[in-house]
Design a protein with these regions (language model features):
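Membrane-helix interface/capping segments
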Residues: 54-88
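Juxtamembrane "helix-exit" motif on the non-cytosolic side of transmembrane helices
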Residues: 24-37, 98-108, 134
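Hydrophobic alpha-helical membrane-insertion segments
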Residues: 83-116
């Protein structure tokens, strides 16, 4: 169980980043609903900022783990970023599954699933603009895709950091290297 006790802080930070970005995305999309061009800008900004925050945080965790591994104090665990993303995104996947249930007609869970789908739309506010523009709000597979997207970014960021690959080289330089 050291897998879950070691990265507790980082997993909580992933969840907090999602909540903050959801509020940001929801507020910006609701403020720009009347204007499609502004909604597009806000959707791109919300998704881009979310991807940057998650990728950068996981890159730093991967880089720190690499330093510890080089010093012999850490053994590489390929499942670590995946499990962190699943724990932080448990609400996302649960909500996505409930959205799927909401689409099955005449089920006992229909009302509960619709309530859960609306809660998910609040949790995924940073994707709301893009999904709204694509007119796919009622397609439950879109919400599962959104939940899977966060897992993909988390795994890519961690592995890039662990291998020392940087998409923005100046962002991950030390002070000595910048001068």
């Amino acid at each position: 169980m050291t897998m879950f006790s070691d990265p507790k802080y980082e997993t909580a930070k992933l969840l907090l980043n999602q909540i903050v970005m959801s509020v940001f995305g929801y507020v910006t999309v609701m403020a720009t609903t009347a204007s499609v061009p502004l909604t597009i800008v806000c959707a791109v900004l919300g998704i881009g900022l979310y991807v940057f925050l998650i990728y950068n945080m996981m890159w730093e965790i991967g880089a720190k783990d690499r330093i510890r591994a080089d010093a012999g104090r850490y053994e590489y665990k390929a499942k670590k970023p995946f499990l962190m993303a699943l724990v932080a995104g448990a609400l996302n996947f649960t909500g996505g599954l409930l959205c799927l249930l909401a689409m099955i007609p005449n089920t006992v869970c229909l009302n509960i699933a619709h309530v859960a789908a609306n809660i998910c739309k609040l949790l995924w506010g940073h994707f709301l603009g893009a999904v709204k523009l694509m007119l796919m709000l009622e397609n439950p597979f879109v919400w599962l895709l959104v939940a899977s997207f966060a897992v993909l970014i988390t795994v890519l960021g961690y592995n890039a950091g662990y291998r020392g690959i940087s998409l923005i080289p100046s962002l991950h330089k030390s002070k000595k290297d910048r001068e």
